[in-house]
Amino acid sequence: MARAHNATLESIQYARGTLRLLDQRKLPLETVFDEILTVDDIWTAIKEMRVRGAPAIAVSAALAIAVAAGNELKKKDGACNSVDGTRRFLLESCDTVMTARPTAVNLSKTLIQLKRDIADVTANTAGGLVEACAVLAEKIYAEDVACNEGIMRHGAAHLTQLVKKSKVSVLTICNTGALATSRYGTALGVVRQLFYEGKLEQVYACETRPWNQGARLTVYECVQENIPCTLICDSAVSALMGSRPIDAVIVGADRICRNGDTANKIGTCNLAVAAAHYGVPFFVAAPSTTLDPMTADGESVVIEERETMELTHSMATQQRVVAEGPSLRIWNPVFDITPAALVTGGIITERGVLQPSATAPFFDITRIVSAS
């Protein structure tokens, strides 16, 4: 029997004029919400990965800019003391926040569109323009929730039909659930839907070093809803696929290029290579805002690299646990590129499942985007 949707987990707490974001670095040991008051607050929250997950970053950014403008409006000599000053503040805020993290396309696409919409708003007062921005941001929020629901529904239905088993076992990486989006999730949203319908045997979650989003966040979400979950270390994926019945690999995405090449959490390509070897269908689940027809392929994607201490220091104690020496170099890319040829199952969006062609180009992202 299908279960009702459960939306008890949330990383974004918003009401007009106020925004609080869950500091996901502290989960699962602490549940701490940070109040976001300024543009600097949201830039730092994104940069420091207090908020993470491409959809959640984009939604939080839009809401935060509206909240920051409202707070600026309250200042006697603030930047929002005129219509022109407010518009300038909003546009410059979008530009600033876009620089926080470069790889996820949702952030830049969302804020570029928000800038266009703000430029088109006709307002007689600064307060009217701030209110219009809040309405635009709230629309972005609501649309992401609707995207989550569409991805869940289409993905679960497609997998059920493909696998033709009463229950499905799925492997995933990172965290792509309610904590990474506005409500239910993308790849983990599909897992949720399978669970709600009584069709999930097991979800296997990679720990996802170095931030352990799988161990800390995905497992946390599964435990909260009693979703059957098995945690594995990242290096166990090939052994898992070779020894246990894995019906599909489902991952999220931070950017899907015009040819279908996909930027996602580091380690995703490892899963795709292993899945191809063992004949396991590999799916990418993401909202259509993650589709990027302007970027030709994975070679054109800027891959974010983070601080070396994420690899050399214990996250719990902040003490160095790796030897130091002049011959040592540290490489810490946050994302990798999965070639479109390895996305063998298809791309799941809120519009349906885009299945690959038999030969290159395997996906026509431009056609999908232009059809919207």
Swiss-Prot record:
Family designation: Belongs to the eIF-2B alpha/beta/delta subunits family. MtnA subfamily.
Function: Catalyzes the interconversion of methylthioribose-1-phosphate (MTR-1-P) into methylthioribulose-1-phosphate (MTRu-1-P).
Residues of the active site: D254
Source taxon at top rank: Eukaryota
A GO biological-process term: L-methionine salvage from methylthioadenosine
GO cellular component: cytoplasm; nucleus
Catalytic activities: 5-(methylsulfanyl)-alpha-D-ribose 1-phosphate = 5-(methylsulfanyl)-D-ribulose 1-phosphate
Major localization class: cytoplasm
Record localization: Cytoplasm; Nucleus
EC number: 5.3.1.23
Organism: Trypanosoma cruzi (strain CL Brener)
GO MF, any single term: S-methyl-5-thioribose-1-phosphate isomerase activity
Matching SUPFAM superfamilies: NagB/RpiA/CoA transferase-like
Listed name of the protein: Methylthioribose-1-phosphate isomerase 2
Annotated pathway: Amino-acid biosynthesis; L-methionine biosynthesis via salvage pathway; L-methionine from S-methyl-5-thio-alpha-D-ribose 1-phosphate: step 1/6
This protein's UniProt keywords: Amino-acid biosynthesis, Cytoplasm, Isomerase, Methionine biosynthesis, Nucleus
Residue numbers marked as site, Transition state stabilizer: C174
